[in-house]
Amino acid sequence: MHNVKIFCKFRGGAVIIYLEIGEIMLKKDLNTKQVGNLFGVDESTVRRWAMSGKIKCIPSAGGHRKFSYNDIVDFANKKGIKLNISAENKNLNPKSAIPKIVENALKQDYKFVEKSLIELYLGGVQLTSLMDDFIEPVLVSIQNHLDNNKISVAEEHIARKIVSKGLNQFKLSVINTKKDNGKHVLTLNLENDIPDLPIDMIQILLEDEGYNVHNCGSHTSIRNIKSLISKKNYDAIFIYLCDRQCCTSTLVDNIDKTNSDLEEIIKLADKYEIKLFLGGPSFENINQKLLKSFNLFTKYSEALLINKIK
């Protein structure tokens, strides 16, 4: 069962809806009755909304309707209804949410991570803020635990995997991947960069904008990139250079290889007319001439600059 407690209050003529999501595993959608309770209307009203296209739904084989979190939030925004988390939940700011997510990631509880992200999203936190102000600081905090010898390398890797799993479960719950603007994007880490969480975060942001994202993940070689580009037309390539303990592409020992790979990618982009985006916390060791060929970003939200570049 979907363990969601719903509280409705009227304030200044507006309906404010509070949700308290239970500790058990979250379902990916709500039924007509649950949506009716959520908005304080009967089921027939929800059915009329759905039939008229006011609120999107997915019809099931048995004739029932399913409503995604994404579509519920979109509808609430259009109608001026404020969705909020239960007043008992005080974790809607980074200062209080981040330590709890880190704590549970270290406990290997991906369900808590997923639940927290969904609560934040339903509470009005934008996807861009979720990536910049919550998930990234969580990753920084986990790295700090490792740097301060509070956890082992293995524990750091597992905690990151837990965050990754929670994030991808969140994606399945709320991100509308049916949007399609007809554009294709390739996302990747270069060789010597192992973690793919930043690339996953960029993928979620781009897919929410309607881009078809082909995520190569980590440790992608130039040979593989050439193969992919020769077989499919891409509008843009996103590369992320990490500087954490398990990433070495920006270290002195590997920087020549990294610069060489970036130069090859620039040549491919020129040949196939592909826009280039390079993200990361720092580009200090990257050849400055090469950087001129990239649209640079240091925050995940800045990846959406792609919408403004012709």
Regions found by a protein language model. Give the residues of each.
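Generic non-transmembrane alpha-helix signal with a bias for helix starts/N-cap capping motifs
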Residues: 29, 42-43, 113, 199, ...
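C-terminal regulatory/effector modules of DNA-binding transcriptional regulators
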Residues: 149-152, 165-310
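Surface-exposed charge patches
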Residues: 34, 47-48, 118, 204, ...
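A short, structure-level motif marking secondary-structure boundaries and short turns
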Residues: 18, 29-32, 86, 126-128, ...
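Long amphipathic alpha-helical segments
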Residues: 38, 43-47, 52-175
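Polyanion-binding surface elements
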Residues: 22-45
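Short, intrinsically disordered or compositionally biased N-terminal tails of bacterial proteins
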Residues: 1-24
